[in-house]
Amino acid sequence: MTKKLAALIWLRFKLFTVNKSILFEIVSPFIFAYFYKYLYSLQKISTQNSDFLGFLIPFSLSIGISIPIIAILSEEQEKNSLSALMLSGVHYFEYLISLAIVSLFFALCIIIIIPLILNSKVSILNFNYFFSSTFMAISVCLISLIAGLLAKTQVIGQVISLPVVAITSFLPMLATINNTCKAIVNYSFISLFYKYIQEPNLALGNNSKSLVIVLLWIALLITITYLIIQIYRKDLFNYDWH
């Protein structure tokens, strides 16, 4: 299984880097970061504070990670590539985990490089920042896997990706100006990252409520993914039987 998984990971990595549209989606967060930095410099506004990261990191993850995952899964389902892989002996676990691993690799690139582009005061070695943003990236990845599995065609995938991107990108920003949005964020998968942005010097131990909320979200998303996989396995079995 290890060799098969390693081969799938390599194939996924090649797909991310060879497909021009997917590669552009991955690179676009860094382009946006440079653009915003230039735009703010014209207005003599600093991009070094953590508040700016509070918008740009979720936005970058939704554009650079969420959209490619949904696009890949929806395209493979439309072309019945998933069924072909299952019939050839590839397990659902291997299929999804390979996509998740490659996606999280690029997510970590976003988490590390974006603060460097912005000359942010937030150090990439800051445990609170790295921990909270990584947990958010895992949640975004799982949500995207679920959305991609539910999309039977590329058109449906594009439609589903819009609310996923909108919620991930703009909810943290709206939380700063609207109490209802703030309450939603406090109980969402963005909760821990949002708390860090609000209080960068606060230890994670004092954010135990947000940590528990994020862990519950991850557990819920993994459970939903598992249930969808079980349904697909049943459908594939019925297809073979007939």
What is the predicted role of each segment?
Residues 1-28, 238-242:
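Aromatic- and glycine-rich beta-strand/loop motifs that create alpha-glucan
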Residues 20, 134-171:
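A structural motif at transmembrane helix-loop-helix junctions in multipass membrane proteins
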Residues 92, 100-152:
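Alpha-helical transmembrane segments and their short interhelical loops
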Residues 172-219:
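Terminal transmembrane helical anchor/hairpin motif
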